[in-house]
Amino acid sequence: MSEKEELPLTLTSIGAATATSDYHQRVGSSGEGISSSSSDVDPRFMQNSPTGLMISQSSSMCTVPPGMAATPPISSGSGLSQQLNNSSSSKLCQVEGCQKGARDASGRCISHGGGRRCQKPDCQKGAEGKTVYCKAHGGGRRCEYLGCTKGAEGSTDFCIAHGGGRRCNHEDCTRSAWGRTEFCVKHGGGARCKTYGCGKSASGPLPFCRAHGGGKKCSHEDCTGFARGRSGLCLMHGGGKRCQRENCTKSAEGLSGLCISHGGGRRCQSIGCTKGAKGSKMFCKACITKRPLTIDGGGNMGGVTTGDALNYLKAVKDKFEDSEKYDTFLEVLNDCKHQGVDTSGVIARLKDLFKGHDDLLLGFNTYLSKEYQITILPEDDFPIDFLDKVEGPYEMTYQQAQTVQANANMQPQTEYPSSSAVQSFSSGQPQIPTSAPDSSLLAKSNTSGITIIEHMSQQPLNVDKQVNDGYNWQKYGQKKVKGSKFPLSYYKCTYLGCPSKRKVERSLDGQVAEIVYKDRHNHEPPNQGKDGSTTYLSGSSTHINCMSSELTASQFSSNKTKIEQQEAASLATTIEYMSEASDNEEDSNGETSEGEKDEDEPEPKRRITEVQVSELADASDRTVREPRVIFQTTSEVDNLDDGYRWRKYGQKVVKGNPYPRFSSSKDYDVVIRYGRADISNEDFISHLRASLCRRGISVYEKFNEVDALPKCRVLIIVLTSTYVPSNLLNILEHQHTEDRVVYPIFYRLSPYDFVCNSKNYERFYLQDEPKKWQAALKEITQMPGYTLTDKSESELIDEIVRDALKVLCSADKVNMIGMDMQVEEILSLLCIESLDVRSIGIWGTVGIGKTTIAEEIFRKISVQYETCVVLKDLHKEVEVKGHDAVRENFLSEVLEVEPHVIRISDIKTSFLRSRLQRKRILVILDDVNDYRDVDTFLGTLNYFGPGSRIIMTSRNRRVFVLCKIDHVYEVKPLDIPKSLLLLDRGTCQIVLSPEVYKTLSLELVKFSNGNPQVLQFLSSIDREWNKLSQEVKTTSPIYIPGIFEKSCCGLDDNERGIFLDIACFFNRIDKDNVAMLLDGCGFSAHVGFRGLVDKSLLTISQHNLVDMLSFIQATGREIVRQESADRPGDRSRLWNADYIRHVFINDTGTSAIEGIFLDMLNLKFDANPNVFEKMCNLRLLKLYCSKAEEKHGVSFPQGLEYLPSKLRLLHWEYYPLSSLPKSFNPENLVELNLPSSCAKKLWKGKKARFCTTNSSLEKLKKMRLSYSDQLTKIPRLSSATNLEHIDLEGCNSLLSLSQSISYLKKLVFLNLKGCSKLENIPSMVDLESLEVLNLSGCSKLGNFPEISPNVKELYMGGTMIQEIPSSIKNLVLLEKLDLENSRHLKNLPTSIYKLKHLETLNLSGCISLERFPDSSRRMKCLRFLDLSRTDIKELPSSISYLTALDELLFVDSRRNSPVVTNPNANSTELMPSESSKLEILGTPADNEVVVGGTVEKTRGIERTPTILVKSREYLIPDDVVAVGGDIKGLRPPVLQLQPAMKLSHIPRGSTWDFVTHFAPPETVAPPSSSSEAREEEVETEETGAMFIPLGDKETCSFTVNKGDSSRTISNTSPIYASEGSFITCWQKGQLLGRGSLGSVYEGISADGDFFAFKEVSLLDQGSQAHEWIQQVEGGIALLSQLQHQNIVRYRGTTKDESNLYIFLELVTQGSLRKLYQRNQLGDSVVSLYTRQILDGLKYLHDKGFIHRNIKCANVLVDANGTVKLADFGLAKVMSLWRTPYWNWMAPEVILNPKDYDGYGTPADIWSLGCTVLEMLTGQIPYSDLEIGTALYNIGTGKLPKIPDILSLDARDFILTCLKVNPEERPTAAELLNHPFVNMPLPSSGSGSVSSLLRG
């Protein structure tokens, strides 16, 4: 019942009658009252009803009280009192519990309403209770507003305060207002504002409050709609939408999607077009991209600007042979640009410029055709073949078309319709055309494929239409606006290029209908006259003159492909209805107008069978006639398939765009074919389609019979007893050639019945051979399919979906280069078989391939899950739609319901849990970059059923932590070979040679760091690779799509500022220094570092450097560049020298500049004194020179007046002024760095006093003024309370140091090295934080200063100090004491032994020092002791207590010999009750003395300090004597020679001479000369081992006992001692190391000669032992002939039953590997070693030997730094997999492991490159890879990682050695000329190589 029919509530005479209140009548009303949609009302007033209706909580019935007699209705009039009196009685009040008497017929007392009437006008009912209204009008009811207890007002459900009694304010609405609002429910009352975060009530019909636009009218002209949001505009005019232009935040204007500044609200300037302009152009998108635009004398040109011409002109600069003409062109166009010449003027200039340059005109036309589909033609004659070269449609004038025809030697075939014909077209009467011309309509055609149309003269239109006054009138709402002027004449030429489609376009004013002929086989249209001049339309007598001349195929040979690809069209003549409805058709880009339904499937086609032209107005008004289209029956319309979309607009049907042709790529996943009339239950098809769609499968459902099928992976054919596809033969014929699976479904019949009922399908093959059809029917029954007879349809559908998913998931995977391994690793983490709910996070930088990997995983495993949900670009979706909407969409997909059914506020947790716990779900959340994006999902994910998996991708690792993801997988970048696959050479192959291309490719790959998105961008960029390579090297700003937009996405202000600072200034700088500066700038550095690392934008290297990938750094710099592309002075950060120079010289700096880093190399210019005055926000200033030897820079001839007070960093090398500016306030300065400056004082006069007395230096932490030669003193630093670092090295004019330095409690580092005029040092006892103090070179410093006890490193070399006070013992934390070249130092206190933490003591050059203190105390930590060039003549006995000593240098200053060192690298604590004491033993008779000692037993290893003796400048191998070892018992005090052995001459100054001279006399005993004494001595030895002499036979056996084992030794080849004598007997010593062939031990002969031998087990060789021994012995025989200073000499072999022994020269310093493990090797040391290795390799290669095993472990070092190649030549007889040599193997060795003749000396060069890399980095190449991966990488040519921190020469040397092609590697002789090998050595004062060993 409607509102107008509502009646007041009355009591009927029926006993229990009920009546519905006014309010509840509205609830029950279907069309009015309160809406049944829950979205229109406040949820607080909703109850849990299944329909979602709002049910009132008050009673909806009014019932007569019990016991009350039924009475007739109370009526008005004079009989009212009588009725009441008659009904009154002595009855009690009917209210329960009331004992009062009833007042009247109401049955109630006065207190309960008896006797009182309702106060509602015209209401005669009794009041209810104590209220003044009856029950129907609110009496007795309470306000339903939440929490309100007042009575309802009137017939409403609310009190007066909450809307009761008030009416809706919406226009003529008479409903009651809802709640506190001024509107009813229908018009917004009770609803909440939908603005995110707003909780106010909606105001007006839209769900927005007044603050957000509710109730406001649109402010756009005469619009009557309601405003949306805060915009003040309705949705039609852009309200609630933002401008789509990037970085624009203004509201969109109208439907354009753009603000007014970017084109919104403006109309297209094309004649006849009423659409809005697109962007900043003057035309809509359709006029720019859909049809060609006009260029004529009227100046109507579509969007071509002077800038377009300038861009093209600059691009073709090289094509101008005359540079002056190019300059003229450029000057003309620039004048046009600056003078603001209009479009017509620009066109005129362009035509003049391109005269005589047809090639440039053609190129410019091609450029414009691609951008705007516009073509400019010259005014004069032009070649006929020009039209064939122009791409796309073009336009020309009528005169130009005549020129084309004349050049083609053709006469135009012209038909001129008479005026009567035109009149007949207007009136609709049939007329026969004549040949008389009419000026109102001119149509010409020719056979050259060009159609020329001249518009009719402008005709006046009706007022409702368009006024024809020569201007384009546009209608906007109720207003008409005068537009642009029509051109006086317009000729349009369309180059169609297809003989099957001839088109005549209507005139721009819409007065001519468009006629289209479609003929697949070039047949004549139906009902066409034989003369070809007139076409009569079917069903109508109306005729229109048109062109029917056929176009020859030869004229369109270039378009042959297009002709073949055209779809067959039905042979009919159609007319396009050109009306305003065409504006609603879809544009070519797929956009649809508002309100139009965007359908996935094409609508049914409709055939036009009759065209009638109806008269719209009287003919005398000269109005236009519109064609009205009439159709046949629906069945015939449905069967129409002419390739075009037909849309219905009211009663009209309009021909739309053609259907898209199916491309060669897959268009659909599944196509379903069925007969619509044959399926009795259409629900089966709909359920099947819905099930497929829920699994993310694209489905094309087709019941019409068409020949062409879209490409698909699965084709489902539903076969019935009466249906089979008409193209079944075609389907089966292409079944084996197409990648498609066909599944037949036999619907309600078996396959047997299907074949038996073949007679029912005769109608399909009446025209074909029955045998083929019978075979086809039989074949389809044998194909895998489904039969639906008694089976449940739901089960069958599930089975079909599963099989379809298997087929789709087995499709060809995307070519993911380098991702397969990572996909498998993630799948192993997912553990699909497990039943737990597991989540995986995929983490990596932007563009690394996270989404691609997730999609591939989804493709692989989605078939195993019941429900799969993929949310792509989740962060963006949340930003656009909001959290609630995204979660509702997510739940709708998981629960498989429609999105509008789910409401977050309505759904219950228990319902979710119960539904989801029964599902096995796969969820992929892509691009989750904020925890808040998935915060609402987290609880839902916990409800998933067993076996569910959640995969989340993000750039932010912290998201995974907050979301409590089980496993996080970091995506790895591509390696070099796979990265190179993504780079496309393109045109570079023509220009670049393979070598140059390879070099550039590697540079680009290094820049990309294996990021696929960056590599794809670099491969597609159109810049030359040479220029691009230079940009990459200098990390210039580069815009990388996708990377640029997402780099700063999600960064807060702190992280963004740190990110840009590092990208521009601080990349690969020490983290602590960067953090110090950033903290001083107000950033939270460590928090920002952590955030950037989590977001994959930054890494912290193992050397504590902040490291940013090159492409991310380039992107960050591009962000800064785009702050102001044209004005560098408006950017926040400057680092480019050219830009900075421009800013300095032209004084264009602004307050926007925050940082300047200028490399002054090759720069020299003058700047004005106030160059920094405008840069008030400058906080980082660094002027430096990258090459120290080049001194250039900025000079200030007039001085410097200003520096910004906000500076945190002032780094200025070669500062040219004597002091800082007076106006400079350093209150914010964190680092002051002025090395090599001309400053004499930092501040002058009052400024100096101000800085020292105030807290202006409170933030200063680092001050460096090194090598400032003119600096005489530094100011007081008492205010710099946070100063931590002071560097005054090289300030040789500095006279004194201020006493204020003692107040610097936080000072850690103080360097005064080279301050030669400094005499006194203030007390530093109170510097409690001081750790490093360097006073070296303070040559006038004579007193030992008072130093803080916390100092760890003290350098005092080169001073005048004579003695070290005993108070040095107070420096309990001292680790290093350097007193080198302290020539006046005479003695050291014994208290020096109390320095328990001292590790290094350098006394080299202390020539006055005569003795080293002797003490029984142990210095357990001392590892290095340098006593060279001192006057110490004898080592104290306490030297043996230095148990941790690794190296001891000792030189006799009088005789310049010898040096004593201890090379052991490691030491451990002595076991209890064990001791170690060094002893020196010898024989004074013949000076044969050895250094001996007891064995030191330690935990885990056995070690004995070894003393190496150097006798001259070079090292003689025979002079090396080693001590100790794994020999049981003590060695004899004197090792004697056998009488038969040859005794070599002992030169003076040799080892023996040295030990004899320095050893204590008591340790030297006379030797025994008789053999008997020697034998007796040996027999009484307690070692358990015996020296057994070998006889004269070839072999001899002897036994060596060691524990419980014994073995017999037999000599197989002569073993030579160091002096050429035979070794007749020997003893095994300590283990030196283990190699690939066996273990290496120290050996000692009976004559005291030490050597090394390799013990190789013969048992490992099996049955091939004998053959293998022969090969080894033959190799050793050859190797023993080699004599070179850089090659370890082989001395011979011997063997026993189980082992082979190979004897070699003993080199005692150890291998290069042990050396770099102990010390970091510098470039100069590695260069020295490399040159010696090359010397040895050259010698070997010249002799025809190949080392085959070059690595640091096989390169031994002597005490003087001489290297010797060892362990070579034997790799040939070893298996590849048995040796760990693969880290250094060359690719050809990997590829041919057993073909030793397949590679040669270049293999050694590759190994040498790896060895040099190992020495420089301290890491074995490929050590981070497994052996299989490493071998694969080497075999494929992937180089090991080469750090960027290496020098250029070192990198070049390594890359030169690591050429993949062996033929490209240089020889060892060629490498000896490389700059890296010839690097000069550092100076060494002592002449010792120990300094080199320390690097």
Swiss-Prot record:
Q: What GO cellular component is one of the record's annotations? A: nucleus
Q: Which residues form the TIR domain?
A: 666-808
**LRR repeat feature ranges:** 1206-1227, 1228-1249, 1259-1281, 1282-1304, 1306-1328, 1329-1351, 1352-1371, 1373-1395, 1397-1419, 1421-1442
Give the protein name, as stated in the record: Probable WRKY transcription factor 19
At the highest ranks, the source species' classification is:
Eukaryota, Viridiplantae, Streptophyta, Embryophyta, Tracheophyta
Q: Which GO terms describe its biological process?
A: defense response; signal transduction
Q: Where in the cell is it found?
A: Nucleus
- What residues form the membrane-spanning segments? none
Q: What PANTHER family does this protein map onto?
A: LEUCINE-RICH REPEAT-CONTAINING PROTEIN, TIR DOMAIN-CONTAINING PROTEIN
